[in-house]
Amino acid sequence: MTLRSVLLALSLGAVTVEAAAAQEVPGAAPAGPLVIQADRVLDGRGGVIRDTRIVIEHGKIARLDPHAAGVTYDLRGYTVLPGWIDVHVHIGSHFGRDGRLATDKEPPAEAALGAAANAWRTLMAGFTTVQSVGEAADKTLRDAIDAGGVPGPRILTSLDPIIGRGDSTGSEEQLRAMVRERAERGADVIKIFASKSQRVGAGPTFTEAQLAILCGEAKARGLRTLVHAYRSSVSAAARAGCSQIEHGTYADSADVAEVARAGAYFSPQVGLVVQSYLENKAHYLGIGNYTEEGFAIMARDLPLDYAICRAAVATPGLKIVFSTDATAGAHGRNAEEFLGRVKECGQSPMAALISANSVNAASLGMADRLGAIAPGLEADIIALDGNPLEDLTAVRRVVFVMKGGVVYKWAGASAARAAKP
């Protein structure tokens, strides 16, 4: 069985099992209009719309019209908002049959099953678009979802990352060739490791000049760059013209200010990835650099993650995106990052939510397609049980998921109808 056929087989099982518990069965976006009635809509750009109806045609938002006839989905009593975007996940990272972190020794068919299951969990959590950075196999899943064969979020992928080794990484031409090769294979973004893992010291792996070559070549080919960076590599990546900088642990406010001056996007993770690692330690320990020492470093330095996030929120003009770095054990829990951003960083609930909508869409160069409830955009729409502006834990209670005009989840249908007069 090929990788693609495994994905297609899984999709049939996933849809059958999950849809049986829901009120709607996923399929192609209907050509005729759908109408969502809502009394509270967060538009993804900072606005709140009251008592309206969202008209959807051919998978896109056609208009907002409070008088539109023929309500298809009555979401009054819930909070309606654009589907969330997570710009840093590892969709293929999963635990194998033995409960341990799956490695490249896992059979391809099982790897495909794990990735597709993660995609489904992520979609059910309200994330309708993700950027997965780290595996060549992401392309197969991306294409299968786009073709409608597998249910999951829209995926953008870097394929395999570019990992630095200092001067031994290669000449200028070799560095440019690394970018070109990924572009030719269909990468949507170029992932660059400018620092080693936090678990092994977080030292630099590329010079600023090397980063400028890589990010410059990507830009020349119309591709964005996402850079894994700690310490001074944060400001080096900003000066090098890279698009998005992730993590930032051990950096300081001056480094973050450099990112703001450069106009790059920045994301410090505080609410999910380290916590998930620590919770799932037994599933990771002894594989690669997941050592006792590495886990101790992550636990010890979590307050430094909070500190750089607070510095980021306090930096004028800094464009903070929403990303989780979700790996095995964290998929489907992406929304926990919202709570971390508000509690540990001082971000307002609205700012945190916008970061996963219009800010993230802009960071992907897709503001004309995603990230807001507005005419002409993709009908990626979710609903929460509760008002996240008053009770942020509502982000954990996703009751409705639509992507591209197709409903994948409407768990509250029966209860909602029974409660309506």
Language model regions located:
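Histidine-rich, glycine-flanked metal-binding segment
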Residues: 24-32, 41, 45-81
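Histidine/acidic-residue-rich catalytic or RNA/ligand-binding cores of hydrolases
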Residues: 95-98, 142-143, 234-241, 272-287, ...
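Active-site gating loops and adjacent loop-to-helix segments of metal-dependent hydrolytic enzymes
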Residues: 91-112, 120, 151-152, 156-159, ...
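Metal-associated gating/positioning segment near the N- to mid-region
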Residues: 78-147, 209, 237-240
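C-terminal cap of metal-dependent C-N hydrolases
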Residues: 356-358, 362, 375-419
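His/Asp/Glu-enriched, well-ordered alpha-helical/loop segment
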Residues: 218-220, 290, 301-387
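Divalent metal-dependent hydrolysis catalytic cores, especially in the metallo-beta-lactamase
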Residues: 112-138, 152-163, 187-197, 224, ...
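Histidine/acidic residue-rich metal-binding segments in metalloenzymes
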Residues: 174-183, 188-194, 199-266, 283, ...
